[in-house]
């Protein structure tokens, strides 16, 4: 992909979920409701803590988001696993952005720590992904550290997020 955009809006992310952004064999983001971001203001192959790439994405929080009604009635909080999934989504998106082909699959995470929560009173969740390694050969895989912030305060940290792109997922 030549002259790659360094940012994406909601319509771009929805195009990715339909398989229209990175070609017919490229990775896709999930569709709503599992699409856990509204925009990506930064994509870089050279920035980040390790100098191997950085992604920043944002999710606007409103009290009517679907997960607040069911998790938990009377005690609404965004499930932590959705923030973790968003970080995996962004690692896969980055792999497509750098030209990787295949279907994205989360392969694991080394460590996750939750030190806060996303409540309906929050305004914005920010995801920051710093790439440690990107392999784009026969094997396509990204390894990154990530963090989730709510209204500027760090609440989750994930070390060694791992996502691969696969031509054939039938053996999974």
Curated annotation (Swiss-Prot):
Q: Which organism is it from?
A: Aliivibrio salmonicida (strain LFI1238) (Vibrio salmonicida (strain LFI1238))
Give the Enzyme Commission number.
4.2.1.59, 5.3.3.14
The UniProt entry's GO biological process terms, in alphabetical order, are: unsaturated fatty acid biosynthetic process
UniProt record similarity statement: Belongs to the thioester dehydratase family. FabA subfamily.
Q: Which InterPro entries match?
A: FabA, FabA_FabZ, HotDog_dom_sf
**Alphabetical list of Gene3D superfamilies matching this protein:** Hotdog Thioesterase
This chain's protein is named: 3-hydroxydecanoyl-[acyl-carrier-protein] dehydratase
CDD domains membership: FabA
Indicate where this protein resides in the cell: Cytoplasm
Residues at the active site: 71
Q: What GO CC terms are in its UniProt record?
A: cytoplasm
NCBIfam families, per the entry: fabA, PRK05174.1
Q: What does this protein do?
A: Necessary for the introduction of cis unsaturation into fatty acids. Catalyzes the dehydration of (3R)-3-hydroxydecanoyl-ACP to E-(2)-decenoyl-ACP and then its isomerization to Z-(3)-decenoyl-ACP. Can catalyze the dehydratase reaction for beta-hydroxyacyl-ACPs with saturated chain lengths up to 16:0, being most active on intermediate chain length.
Query: What would be the name of the gene that encodes this protein?
Result: fabA
Which keywords are on file for this protein?
A: Cytoplasm, Fatty acid biosynthesis, Fatty acid metabolism, Isomerase, Lipid biosynthesis, Lipid metabolism, Lyase
Catalysed conversion reaction: a (3R)-hydroxyacyl-[ACP] = a (2E)-enoyl-[ACP] + H2O; (3R)-hydroxydecanoyl-[ACP] = (2E)-decenoyl-[ACP] + H2O; (2E)-decenoyl-[ACP] = (3Z)-decenoyl-[ACP]
Is the keyword Lipid metabolism assigned to this protein? yes
Pfam families referenced in this protein's UniProt entry, alphabetically: FabA
